[in-house]
């Protein structure tokens, strides 16, 4: 028999082993422990991962995984799958889960442009129960719901979201806040009523006021921004300026001591070039006629001579230019009675000592002309005029600053290049804005069946959709003889058309608003409209064509049609009699300010110089504005929101420094031409 103490020793060693085995057995019986789920945190994985977690979960966390999977599906633009997943959620949700579901439903609707359905859902969200990440998403949805329309609610959403963001997202918020502010007109500013404790919003509005007051002088704007930063040190923009305004800090004025003016002095475009050159020189020498203000009844008839669009793609791009236009003798045409209101005088630079040398681009290759201009010490190039030459210069990587007088087919963003053209595309973009601003949402384009119609259609549609518009319809027409056959047969023109289908590359692939990524839903091509919904028609035609098109529209729609009619300057002519003006009753048309009464004295001077050929007057005005733009080259490139009241329109620049022209819109009313209302 073994000693008792030996037995006790062996038993003592056995007990811990037995306990460990029991513990391990108990743990294995419980199964793997579930991962913790936080539905209020950011989504960091793709939808496949979260859907897998849903399949593997059987406890209370399954619903949380479902909600995360829905967020991931929405982030990836998989809206049908997200909708199906929402339908599979249990009816009973916790308060936290219910708030997350409201955000997900709203996001799905906003992404599918169902804003009216999303807004009441957002109103149910209890912001006090949201995490910081959820709050950022909530305000992002409020911002996206605004669809780019600036309002106090939108500004407040940006301001509320800003402290919830970091890094690039925060800078994007500041930039977007500033962009929204710059959309406010002075009338909008005057109508804003904010609370006394909204110091951040007040600071933003004061920054906008400082910008408006000093935008035309970069140095004054620098000083105004610095003063504003001192007065509002706690404003987020005081610590990190909007990107556009930060560029002002590095602004330096471009040298214009020696300007090279590149024009074709021979060939078909010579007449155009001469008009531009005269306008440029008259502006440089300070010999432009001026008047204190345009007064009611004193404005020239805002109409232009009948011209055909150049067929050559390299021709001068002018909305109504024709190198073979017949010259009219005598002094300026006596205008029809107008009722223009006083307008601001276009900007005019004083006489300058700058040296201007003209180079003939029709006598040698443009590359040689540019090289010669550089060797001659040019600090700024104005031109060339022909499109193929502009494309060559854009591809040449020249070190010189260039104000091209045309646009290439594909705009290239160069820090030393701007593009200024009188093009039908430019008019079409302006028309899209004008029609949109008048509250129209279902436009029809009536354009010729040729390349001009293609260009106008593409430009209008792209701009329209950038404003938030939907489908644009188009209807093509043929020659005058075809239109006459139509009117003689009583066919008329119906307010219907086929949808304009833009290349897929031009369609937005996603929308990123204040840190919230909302992919654009995939949509099929819209079906043709049968009419009835159209509320506006933009007509690009000559006057002869318009005289047939408008009555043909009335034949089908009646004289009391609610469709508003708009026309480009192509259909406006000098000398249109009272019968024509009465026939055009109600139609609105665009033209440059110089032909719309902005400066009657200069208009008379120009009309006399060009024998009342208003197509050349337009190019003369272009030359004047080219001089003004050359003296503000770096402002156009670097100072956000910089604009000029030019003779060809209110001039501003895109991010690629394409000069946009906001035109003057007039209307035929009871035989008179009046400002469009």
Swiss-Prot record:
HAMAP family: LpoA. One of its GO terms (biological process) is peptidoglycan biosynthetic process. A lipid is attached at residue 27 (S-diacylglycerol cysteine). PROSITE patterns: PROKAR_LIPOPROTEIN (PS51257). Its main location: membrane. This is Penicillin-binding protein activator LpoA. A lipid is attached at residue 27 (N-palmitoyl cysteine). One of its GO terms (cellular component) is periplasmic side of cell outer membrane. Residues 313-355 have a biased composition (Low complexity). Belongs to the LpoA family. It comes from Pantoea ananatis (strain LMG 20103). Interacts with PBP1a. It is a lipid-anchor.
């Amino acid at each position: 028999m073994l000693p008792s103490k030996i037995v006790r020793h062996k038993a003592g060693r056995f007990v811990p082993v037995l306990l460990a085995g029991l513990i391990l057995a108990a743990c294995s019986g419980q199964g793997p422990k579930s991962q913790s789920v936080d539905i209020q945190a950011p989504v960091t994985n793709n939808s496949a991962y979260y859907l897998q977690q849903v399949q593997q979960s059987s406890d209370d966390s399954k619903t949380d995984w479902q909600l995360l999977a829905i967020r991931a599906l929405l982030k990836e633009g998989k809206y049908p799958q997200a909708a199906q997943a929402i339908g599979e959620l249990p009816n009973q949700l916790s308060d936290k889960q219910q708030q997350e579901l409201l955000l997900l439903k709203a996001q799905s609707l906003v992404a599918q442009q169902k804003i009216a359905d999303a807004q009441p859902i957002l109103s149910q969200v209890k912001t006090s129960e949201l995490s910081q990440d959820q709050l950022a998403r909530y305000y992002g949805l409020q911002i996206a719901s605004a669809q780019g329309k600036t309002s106090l609610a939108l500004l407040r959403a940006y301001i509320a979201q800003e402290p919830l963001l970091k890094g690039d997202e925060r800078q994007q918020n500041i930039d977007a806040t500033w962009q929204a502010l710059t959309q406010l007109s002075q009338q909008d500013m005057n109508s804003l009523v904010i609370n006394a404790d909204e110091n951040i919003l007040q600071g933003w509005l004061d920054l906008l006021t400082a910008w408006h007051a000093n935008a035309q002088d970069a140095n004054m704007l620098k000083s105004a921004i610095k003063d504003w930063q001192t007065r509002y040190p706690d404003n987020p923009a005081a610590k990190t300026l909007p990107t556009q305004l930060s560029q002002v800090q590095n602004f330096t004025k471009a040298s214009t001591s020696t300007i090279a003016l590149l024009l074709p002095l021979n060939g078909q475009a010579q007449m155009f070039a001469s008009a531009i050159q005269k306008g440029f020189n008259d502006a440089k020498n300070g010999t432009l006629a001026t008047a204190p203000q345009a007064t009611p009844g004193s404005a020239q008839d805002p109409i232009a001579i009948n011209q055909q669009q150049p067929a050559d793609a390299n021709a001068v791009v002018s909305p109504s230019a024709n190198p073979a236009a017949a010259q009219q003798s005598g002094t300026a045409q006596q205008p029809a009675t107008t009722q223009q209101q006083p307008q601001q005088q276009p900007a005019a630079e004083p006489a300058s000592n700058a040296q201007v040398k003209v180079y003939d681009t029709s006598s040698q290759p443009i590359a040689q002309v540019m090289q010669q201009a550089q060797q001659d010490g040019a600090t700024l190039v104005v031109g060339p005029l022909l499109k193929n030459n502009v494309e060559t210069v854009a591809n040449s990587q020249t070190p010189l600053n260039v104000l091209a007088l045309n646009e290439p087919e594909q705009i290239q963003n160069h820090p030393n290049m701007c593009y200024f053209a009188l093009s039908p595309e430019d008019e079409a973009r302006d028309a899209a804005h004008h029609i949109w601003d008048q509250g129209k949402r279902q436009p029809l384009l009536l354009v010729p069946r040729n390349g001009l119609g293609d260009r106008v259609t593409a430009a209008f549609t792209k701009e329209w959709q950038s404003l938030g518009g939907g489908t644009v319809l188009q209807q093509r027409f043929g020659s005058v003889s075809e239109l006459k056959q139509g009117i003689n047969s009583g066919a008329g023109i119906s307010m219907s058309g086929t949808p304009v289908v833009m290349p897929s590359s031009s369609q937005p692939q996603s929308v990123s608003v204040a840190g919230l990524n909302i992919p654009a839903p995939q949509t099929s091509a819209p079906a043709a409209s049968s009419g009835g919904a159209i509320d506006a028609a933009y007509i690009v035609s000559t006057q002869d064509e318009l005289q047939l098109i408008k009555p043909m529209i009335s034949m089908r729609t009646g004289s009391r049609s609610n469709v508003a009619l708009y026309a480009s300057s192509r259909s406006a002519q000098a000398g249109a009699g009272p019968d024509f003006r009465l026939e055009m009753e109600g139609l609105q048309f665009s033209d440059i300010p110089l032909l719309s009464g902005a400066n009657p004295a200069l208009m008379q001077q120009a009309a006399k110089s060009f024998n009342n050929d208003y197509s050349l007057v337009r190019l003369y005005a272009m030359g004047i504005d080219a001089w003004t733009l050359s003296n503000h080259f770096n402002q156009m490139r670097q100072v956000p929101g910089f604009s000029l009241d030019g003779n060809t329109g209110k001039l501003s620049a895109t991010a690629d420094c394409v000069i946009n022209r906001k035109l003057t819109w007039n209307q035929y009313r009871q035989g008179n031409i009046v400002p469009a209302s």
